[in-house]
């Protein structure tokens, strides 16, 4: 089978969750209430995220972007992992519930990638508005999993073919539905807890050097073979 990588961004490629960092810096009290409602699942991730960014004025655009450029830290080994995928013609997709205005500039120097699927920011009004161009597909409508904004399982169904060996890399609860579709899950933090609770097998990682070692072993044992 041909390997294909679906990798989360916030808390996975970066050391911390950039949205949480951003909200804590600019609108801590207001965003905390929304975050609590999201964790308690009284509002959807999509509605919560929209409400958070609506707290920010578009006049803060440059300040917000600069803050994230200054504070976001790329996880150790990411460049080596991406280069390995590129050298072995392994499709590498970033699939994130984050937003284009900070994801794209942060990963630009590591590309090109096969694709970046994320939410988009509209700065044309007074407040920042999010546009969700990767919402849930018809398959998600069969279950109570809608409202996730950028729907990772829907992206996987759109991109992956039957011959692909799907590698999902993530850290949070928002990665779990994608993890259930994976042939192998590389997990850290909250995703590990959810995988253990619901008996989904995974391999833990701390840095992308760990991910690289796991993928190399898969290639060497023919669980996943290069496309060339």
Swiss-Prot record:
UniProt keyword Amino-acid biosynthesis present: yes
rRNA-binding found in the keyword field:
no
Name-wise, this protein is 2-hydroxy-3-keto-5-methylthiopentenyl-1-phosphate phosphatase
State which pathway it belongs to: Amino-acid biosynthesis; L-methionine biosynthesis via salvage pathway; L-methionine from S-methyl-5-thio-alpha-D-ribose 1-phosphate: step 4/6
SUPFAM superfamilies (UniProt xref): HAD-like
Catalyzes what? 2-hydroxy-5-methylsulfanyl-3-oxopent-1-enyl phosphate + H2O = 1,2-dihydroxy-5-(methylsulfanyl)pent-1-en-3-one + phosphate
| InterPro entries attached to this UniProt entry | HAD-like_SerB, HAD-like_sf, HAD-SF_hydro_IB_MtnX, HAD_hydro_PyrdxlP_Pase-like, HAD_sf
Kindly list the GO molecular function terms attached to this UniProt entry. 2-hydroxy-3-keto-5-methylthiopentenyl-1-phosphate phosphatase activity; L-phosphoserine phosphatase activity; magnesium ion binding
EC number(s) from the headed UniProt entry = 3.1.3.87
Q: Which Pfam families match?
A: HAD (PF12710)
Q: Which organism is it from?
A: Lysinibacillus sphaericus (strain C3-41)
Name the CDD domains for this protein: HAD_Pase
Q: What is stated as this protein's family in its record?
A: Belongs to the HAD-like hydrolase superfamily. MtnX family.
Q: What job does this protein perform?
A: Dephosphorylates 2-hydroxy-3-keto-5-methylthiopentenyl-1-phosphate (HK-MTPenyl-1-P) yielding 1,2-dihydroxy-3-keto-5-methylthiopentene (DHK-MTPene).
Q: Which UniProt keywords apply?
A: Amino-acid biosynthesis, Hydrolase, Methionine biosynthesis
Gene Ontology cellular component annotations, sorted alphabetically = cytoplasm
Gene Ontology process terms (BP)? L-methionine salvage from methylthioadenosine; L-serine biosynthetic process
